[in-house]
């Protein structure tokens, strides 16, 4: 009887990279985490993915799945296990021009998607970074520059093909395996490896995009006015406020209001954006008409040894004033973290709460803090961050999985309210009762 490794070499048609081989050093780590896996598999077909999953299960090895490799907890690598790197399954195809249906491989990045769709005048509500993978972002939500108009990335998903823990290929949609389709949209990589995503794209023109900056001393009034404006602004406007950017002066850093207006009409854009310009003393304003693909930034790979401590939570309308007050105070403190306040609402909030496993539909804002540096620096900053989040805790809800640097049980509890978690457990038990897929914010099967 052949061993799992022998069967892998027989059935797997892609690259098998092991320690000591030429590509291993460049392939063993993800963007935010280093690892030393025993096998790195680069499938060239869905059959290869199935063979890789069966191998990991049969050999009893930890399994990690890598798309873009951008997860802050480092889900895209491990020590001593198997990494399935989907980078060769990166096709982007417009399969139905009339209905704007797009099929995307599980290893594609959002930069590639935007570039391929641009000549067709189409785009998909995605994230804001070119090198981020379609899979990791979509399976947890997908909050980007079109979120208020077209919803989360996962709200534009109509079907997926998934390799489950037994190596089977399963299609999930509203009509086929709807329990899995519900869970996939927000439940992360808990249920299998998505080899193909089917999205509805939307017509797009060039967009008005850029940054308007104000003095740090005006943070409180600018943030309050910004939120008030967003409550009545057209949903074509999505915006992010950055406070206390350590790379731009920390407490002295200008408040950065990033805006994206989905449309190329100058009058409509001015109607949406000019009220923000009137919120305070404008230091800089580089808003201009740009191709949508150019709104996505290049994702930088940090130097070895740099760690990121990222936390997030959602803010309901009733708590916005107090949260913004705390954010402004923290931003003015001696050594603040990077703080971002992202607008959501709009199309996101029109989806029923229980329609997907992404749970926090009623939120008006999302708050994110981030600290980066060598491990000792990040460790030293943790008590201050804990204190900040202690102040925020009574006024915020949940967490967004894509902006969490850890994956402990309390993180999972924050991402999924009890009823959502209960439903996810049932789906996990059906499709992965042995919990093969643990490289995620893990749902434990009952």
Report residues per predicted region.
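Soluble FAD-dependent oxygen oxidases
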Residues: 1-446
């Amino acid at each position: 009887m052949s061993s799992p490794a022998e069967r892998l070499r027989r059935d797997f048609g892609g690259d098998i990279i092991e320690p000591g081989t030429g590509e291993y050093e460049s392939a063993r780590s993800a963007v935010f985490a280093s690892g030393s896996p025993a096998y790195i598999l680069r499938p060239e077909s869905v059959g290869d993915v199935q063979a890789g999953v069966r191998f990991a299960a049969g050999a009893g090895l930890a399994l990690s799945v890598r798309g873009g490799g951008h997860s802050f907890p480092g889900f895209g690598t491990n020590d001593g296990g198997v990494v399935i790197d989907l980078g060769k399954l990166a096709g982007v195809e417009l399969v139905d021009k009339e209905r704007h249906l797009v099929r995307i491989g599980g290893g594609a990045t959002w930069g590639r998607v935007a570039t391929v769709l641009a000549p067709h005048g189409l785009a998909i509500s995605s994230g804001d970074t070119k090198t981020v993978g379609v899979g990791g972002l979509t399976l947890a939500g997908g909050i980007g520059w079109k979120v208020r108009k077209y919803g989360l990335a996962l709200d534009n998903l109509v079907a997926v093909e998934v390799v489950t823990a037994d190596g089977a290929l399963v299609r999930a949609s509203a009509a086929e395996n709807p329990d899995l389709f519900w869970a996939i949209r927000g439940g992360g990589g808990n249920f299998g490896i998505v080899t193909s995503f089917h999205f509805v794209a939307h017509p797009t023109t060039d967009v008005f995009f850029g940054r308007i900056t104000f003095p740090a001393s005006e943070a409180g009034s600018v943030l309050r006015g910004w939120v008030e404006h967003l409550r009545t602004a057209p949903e074509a406007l999505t915006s992010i406020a950055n406070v206390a950017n350590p790379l731009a002066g920390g407490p002295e850093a200008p408040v950065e209001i990033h805006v994206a207006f989905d449309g190329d009409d100058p009058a409509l854009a001015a109607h949406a954006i000019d009220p923000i310009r009137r919120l305070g003393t404008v230091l800089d304003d580089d808003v201009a008409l740009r191709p949508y693909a150019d709104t996505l930034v290049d994702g930088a790979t940090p130097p070895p040894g740099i760690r990121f401590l990222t936390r997030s939570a959602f803010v309901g309308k009733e708590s916005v004033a107090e949260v913004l007050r705390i954010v402004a105070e923290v931003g003015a403190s001696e050594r603040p973290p990077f703080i971002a306040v992202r607008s959501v609402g709009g199309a996101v909030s029109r989806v029923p709460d229980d329609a997907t496993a992404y749970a926090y539909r009623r939120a008006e804002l999302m708050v994110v803090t981030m600290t980066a540096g060598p491990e000792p620096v990040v460790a030293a900053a943790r008590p201050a961050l804990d204190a900040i989040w202690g102040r925020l805790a009574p006024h915020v809800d949940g967490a967004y999985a894509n902006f969490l640097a850890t994956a402990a049980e309390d993180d999972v509890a924050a991402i999924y309210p009890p009823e959502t978690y209960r439903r996810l457990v049932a789906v996990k038990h059906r499709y992965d009762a042995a919990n093969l897929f643990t490289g995620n914010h893990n749902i434990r099967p009952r």
